[in-house]
Amino acid sequence: MAAADAGLPERAQALAERAVRLVEEPRSIARLAELRARIAFERGSVHTAHDILLSGADRVAELDPAAAGLMLVDAGRNAWQLSDPRRVEEAAARLRRLRLRPEDGLDAAVDAVEAAAVSLNAGPAGALPAMRPLARDARGIERGSYGLRINGAFVAGLVGEFETQRQISVALVEECRTLGMTGLLPIAYVTLAGAELYLGRFRSAAADAAEGLRIATDTGQPHRTGYLEGILAWIAAVEGDEDRCAGLAVRCADHFAATGIANGLAWSEWALAALDLSLGRHTRALDRLEAALAGPVRHQIQAVYFAPDQIEAAVRAGLPDRAKEPLERLAEWADVARLDWADAVLARCRALLEPDDEIFSAALRPHGRPLERARAELGYGEWLRRERRRRDARPHLRAALETFQRLGAGPWARRAAAELRAAGEATAAPAASDRLAALSPQELQIVRLAVTGLTNREIGARLFVSPKTVSHHLYRAFPKLGVSSRVELARLGPDLDPDAAT
């Protein structure tokens, strides 16, 4: 286990294969099965991982139901990532047959596996009530229990509780860094970067995804690589970096072809469509999302989260009839989710189809997702301008432009600026004071740690790079930030939160 945690999969696998012939004690059998399955999954052998977990659970089910339950929960999560209803149902059925006790602490996790089966067969809305408790339970675990906390972070993302997902993930990343658990860092960065993305913390998401990608590549975890590249493709789309988005999307498709895991593919298909939408290629965006829904992506939560893009693409392409199904999909989920952001986004989508001051006002209620709020401001401002209410339109268009600029959402900022000019207001160039935008993802990671007072050696230990590499990146970052020493860097204080303004 220590070799796997330290990011040494080859050594861990060799030791596990040797141990499998020697171990007889039930708990040791369970831990060994978990380890072998984890190595197989991280290296892309997903079906092998599933079979190892089921076999291991069978061997210890009578003697240690809790250990068997943990393995079956992992098997269910892995099968969900394959968009494989049969395998999820198999894990759920075996969980039902175990003699689990309340004190085993697995009730919420078992319910989540049951809910995953419901989600794959009947859609994600019906799974929400059963999934929420796992996310909230995981937030209360302070240390250890890595499997439950990782599952909890994933589930928090599935139920739209992105701040909970971020809190769990931040704690996991910090703990893994401190304990040198390199092998677990990529999955922790997957959940952290995903949460930051949904919350509009794009610079942090890019930096954390890039760091997770570096470690996943170094430790031979192709599944994590594909997932993180999908997140980076989505961020590239928002920034308007067409070449980078397309290149990362190709890599995600290759990972899917090799492993069958749909997470990265779901992100990359959404990324390509989001790029098309932001650049005004509305019919192309709509066609792309509809095509994605014909494959395994339809079982992923992104099918709910990209429904607003599908609706907007249909409306802007002059094809409102094709917005009906995604609107129903989003409304069904939002009605059960009862989240402020989901209600606001649903209102925005309805306002695009039937513009109205009252509906747009509902779309503008605060909810913690700045990109979605800015898109509502833009949509409202566009409609007001078309209605010849230019004075009313300008504050909304101005607010949209300022948010898009802060987020680095170039194509959206250009659209908002054009609308604002059409509404009779000149627009200024983006502020030159955003010093963090010039930093590379690794420079940003290092600067964020340096400002806390950590030495180069301590930063290197956290990020698994040499002190010399840390020094090199700080040397490159200082002039970009307008400082020449660590003392001046520390004075910047809160200004070094890359997403504080969002």
Language-model features: locations:
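Structural motif corresponding to the intra-repeat A-B loop/turn of tetratricopeptide repeats
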Residues: 6, 43, 82, 121-122, ...
